[in-house]
Design a protein with these regions (language model features):
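Short alpha-helical
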Residues: 45-46, 106-109
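Residue-level detector of alpha-helix initiation sites
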Residues: 13-15, 105-107
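Short amphipathic alpha-helix
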Residues: 17-28
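Redox-cofactor binding/interface segments in oxidoreductases and associated redox assembly factors
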Residues: 9, 101-102
Length: 120
């Protein structure tokens, strides 16, 4: 029997990121039915409803984009980025993926950075 493939798919924000991510997950499941897939997205964004509707688990990061109109609000963004990196690292350590795939969107950055730092 094949070893269970564990995959994190990270990203979202728009349908242009989410639906290709779900297609990637579906293709992995078709090729390796016993694989385990976990999505990592941005809290409060579209992926938090679309991914579970497609049958996959998702964990949200407290990440958001920069505010171009009010640069002072970006101080909060930096703290959210740090918190997101810490949370992404914890998710990766707990899930122990074989591979991490980024599809774009706010959540991809911290997740891929931490995966790289952890040697994945």
């Amino acid at each position: 029997m094949d070893k269970k493939l564990k995959v994190i798919v990270s990203g979202g924000g728009t349908g242009g990121h989410i639906f290709p991510a779900i297609s990637i997950a579906d293709a992995i499941k078709a090729a390796k039915p016993n694989s385990e897939i976990l999505f990592v997205g941005a809290e409060g964004r579209m992926e938090m409803t679309r991914v579970p509707a497609a049958g996959y688990d998702i964990i949200g990061l407290p990440i958001c984009g920069f505010d171009r109109k009010n640069p002072f609000k970006n101080i909060v963004v930096l703290f959210k980025l740090m918190r997101s990196q810490i949370k992404a690292k914890k998710i990766i350590r707990k899930f122990k993926p074989d591979v991490v795939v980024g599809v774009g969107g706010y959540a991809s950055g911290p997740t891929l950075r931490m995966a790289g730092k952890l040697g994945i």
